[in-house]
Amino acid sequence: MERLATCACSELRVTCSGEPEKVSLCHCPACQKRTGSAFGIAAFFARENIRVEGASRSYERPSDSGFPVLLHFCPGCGSTVFWEPRRKPDMIAVGVGSFADPTFPAPSQAVYAEFRHPWVGEMASREGLPFGDQQG
């Protein structure tokens, strides 16, 4: 099975072969800032199962593990599509939102729970919350 992840303008594309080795939901402040959201979700694939097409720019940031993370984003639209965790040089992480696939496998772990926004998790089960197919 192949899955395609793209940036917002589709100029940066990542084709991933096979199933992800893990899918991780991360509440750390760095992922919150990277996504502009309350958390990030990454799918980790073996490096040899990844094919990148299109230009990317990169930004290296430190991580809590002491190993840097090299983030790759589209120079046109600015979307971060994938990153290289230097702690795991044989893996590439791809932002799950870049697949835009509601059937993508759910996270198998959640990390940095101490930074979790208290309302995360409540929203999915909240009665009376407006729910629609489009932004209103």
Predicted regions and their residues:
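A short Gly-Trp-Pro
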Residues: 1-136
